[in-house]
Amino acid sequence: MSEQRLKNFKVLTRCLHRFELFKKKDGSRVFSLTLANLSPELLRQIEDFLTDEKAIFLRYPEIYEQFPYSAKIAVKTPKRKRPPILDDEGNEVPKGMPKPRGQNTVADLLTRLRAFILWAIDNGYTTNNPFKHFSIGEIVYGTPIYISNEERNKLLETDLSDDKEVETQRDIFVFQCLVGCRVSDLYKMTYRSIINGAVEYIPRKTKEDRPITVRVPLNDTALKLIAKYQDYSRDMLFPFNTEQNYNRKIKIAFQRAGLDRIVTVLDQQTRQEVQRPLYEVASSHMARRTFIGNIYKKVKDPNLVGALSGHKEGSKAFARYRDIDEEMKKELIGFLD
């Protein structure tokens, strides 16, 4: 089992432990979640539990002390006291409080549980399959939101010298836009990853299932960003921060660069389309989408783009990038004149 799959199953295991403790505290003191008693009704309860763990946390915070919502290992950075995280109303968010899960995330967790149940049946641990009479919600994605090369350059050229931390995370984001890797692979890059003018890495997500080396040539901008932060005593390619802080600083950098065009995104909790300014939806994964989207617009060859992004041949991910962009739409309408 790959490292990423193992991590995902550990997340599921903690969720099920918390659900079991919740049931015990909510009136069923002798409740025990087993392969034998798992039923469609229990699956519906688990689905509801996964959808809104925040409410459970506020009622029974002790459950989350025993089985934390998150067990992330942060990138090592100098210790300093961080300001508390505030919600939209300015109230301090209790440490360890779960974030609302989207329907895709809940469906993904239930799909992993179903895979485990089917494995248990195949290996003789149970004959009970509650998923025969339980339907997992469909995983739905919206159109990928990414920035144009012009917007990326505007972001890079924005003067952020008054806030070095935002400037640094902005520069890392732009570098990620130029190499297209996932943030987990970015954080593992060192100076040894640079070979003959290109960055080489084995995507962590597919390392054990399909260990291929991805090689992405570095353009002048990428090489200048590496040189700007060159520090061989650090070993890591850039002064990385936690992914949470990285995403927070990216949003600030976008806003300061005036990247505020309105985009339509899919609210994963309600599955409704909502309009939001670009800087609000900016995140580390937008860098990967930017790399893929801008190249795919030019070549329209998923296998060629996949050789640079690490996607396997025939990946369904590229189907989401096939929407005709605005410039092409205008050109097509021009044919009617």
Residue ranges, per PLM feature:
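Conserved tyrosine-mediated DNA breakage-rejoining catalytic core shared by Y-recombinases
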Residues: 135-136, 179, 188-227
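DNA/chromatin major-groove-contacting recognition/catalytic segments
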Residues: 154-155, 214-224, 228, 319-337
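Short, charged phosphate-coordinating catalytic segments
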Residues: 117-129, 176-198
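N-terminal core-binding DNA-recognition domain of tyrosine recombinases/integrases
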Residues: 1-4, 13-143, 158-161
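Short, basic (Lys/Arg/His-rich) helix/loop patches that form interaction surfaces
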Residues: 161-163, 231-236, 251-307, 311
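Catalytic-site neighborhood detector that most strongly recognizes the C-terminal catalytic loop/helix
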Residues: 205-207, 243-246, 309-335
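Conserved catalytic core of the tyrosine transesterase superfamily
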Residues: 160-174
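A short, basic/aromatic helix-end/turn motif that makes direct DNA contacts
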Residues: 188-194, 296-298, 306-313, 320-324
